[in-house]
Amino acid sequence: MEFSVKSGSPEKQRSACIVVGVYEPRRLSGIAEQLDKISEGYISNLLRRGDLEGKPGQMLLLHHVPNVLSERVLLVGCGKERELDERQYKQIITKTINTLNDTGSMEAVCFLTELHVKGRDTYWKVREAVESTQNSLYSFDALKTRKGETRRPLRKLVFNVPTRRELTVGERAIEHGMAVSTGTQLCRDVANMPPNICNPAYLASQARQIAENHENLTVTTVGEEQMAKLGMNSYLAVGRGSHNESVMTVMEYKGAVDSTEKPIVLVGKGLTFDSGGISLKPGEAMDEMKYDMGGAAGVIGTMLALCELKLPINVVGILAGCENMPSSNAYRPGDILTTMSGQTVEVLNTDAEGRLVLCDVLTYVERFDPELVVDTATLTGACVIALGKHASGLFSSHNPLAHELLNAGEQSGDRAWRMPLWDEYQEHLESPFADMTNLGGRPAGAITAACFLSRFAKKYNWAHLDVAGTAWNSGANKGSTGRPVPLLTQFLINRAGVEQGE
């Protein structure tokens, strides 16, 4: 899809289709009023006859409107003018794109970016339109012998902005939106791959492909032999039952003017399949445990977006690839593991494995002398119970970092909600035989998991994103969502000090 911005009046547009908004009840937006005036009341007459009420998502396609140069005019219901919010705006854009494809239009000029959305500027509206469009066009059929027959003739979409001085803002919004969309698509593609293809080595190969096309990015891997030398016994224990070797992929992006500038480190849990190990999961929906590498998919997608944007910062992305399988060689409940940090962990349940991988990675990243560390993981079902599918769980021992991430989530529409990380919860991890257990019991499961990780992240500013509820959808729309790529990319854009709005 090709995107561009322009600033012009609707009567001068010669495109295949013009897209304008209509409010409820039957109220023309400013641009629609201009078209109505040009057409001598043609549009308002249709509305008076009840052809369109203006409810959110309603569509009415008009052909050969009098005195209008464009072949078609698409009227889009936008609801009540003062109630148009971010969620409705995204839904309207998605419905518009689907309708345009149904009409057979190859190009369109969209004036919906001129609508008033509460608390949002032109930059946000254009960027969100790009991301919503790309998201609506996504499909994963790489492994189907018969590809989908979906009709998608739309090739070019032009967003109109109110004034010429906003053209630069619009162009920047398209650039950022395309980068986020590219990263989100890679995240979804990698996460949707089946576990017989997407194993830890596959994650590494995907990272190398990005590095081949971006000179600022280098990729190295740490295999099991090197992990053993480093003392990453907790990480190794989790993968011991699998035929697929555990591989930690290290992606180093150097974009700062000063190459010695401290990097931001992103860590992604990469359990390419999680059977639960000896503490075997129930069979129902176990196929979805291929998504237990959603954190790593989010990091690799964010690293691609970062490379596309060429942000002037240094970032290290870690893909903690591993597979948790039952076998005679698998680790067991009751085992006590000595982590890379030297702390010991009593294993109460082998299905609480993500934290055992991440704890060693959080120790490993100390060598980068990081500015800060953010880990992202599909860590706990408890977070899904607490927050559902709308917000990722955010935990942090550093208030400024937590606020930055929350703000990035609000800006990008990929929201998070901060959870407590109080000392009282640490008591749930006490063990009579080791420094701690790997499970805090059923109460506050997402919090105690984050408390566990916090014990290995004391030498830098750290935050943890639990994306177990947001990384993928179940049911009829099963598949990766691409989150938290928008949040993490926005966080990096903000950190880089890149100009965004007006």
Curated annotation (Swiss-Prot):
It is found in: Cytoplasm. SUPFAM superfamilies: Macro domain-like (SSF52949), Zn-dependent exopeptidases (SSF53187). Its main location: cytoplasm. Belongs to the peptidase M17 family. It comes from the Bacteria. GO terms for biological process: proteolysis. This is Probable cytosol aminopeptidase. Binds 2 manganese ions per subunit. It holds the Pfam family Peptidase_M17. The gene is pepA. The active site is at K281, R355. InterPro entries: Leucine_aapep/pepB, Macro_dom-like, Peptidase_M17_C, Peptidase_M17_leu_NH2_pept, Peptidase_M17_N. Mn(2+) 1 binds at D274, D351, E353. Presumably involved in the processing and regular turnover of intracellular proteins. Catalyzes the removal of unsubstituted N-terminal amino acids from various peptides. GO terms for cellular component: cytoplasm.
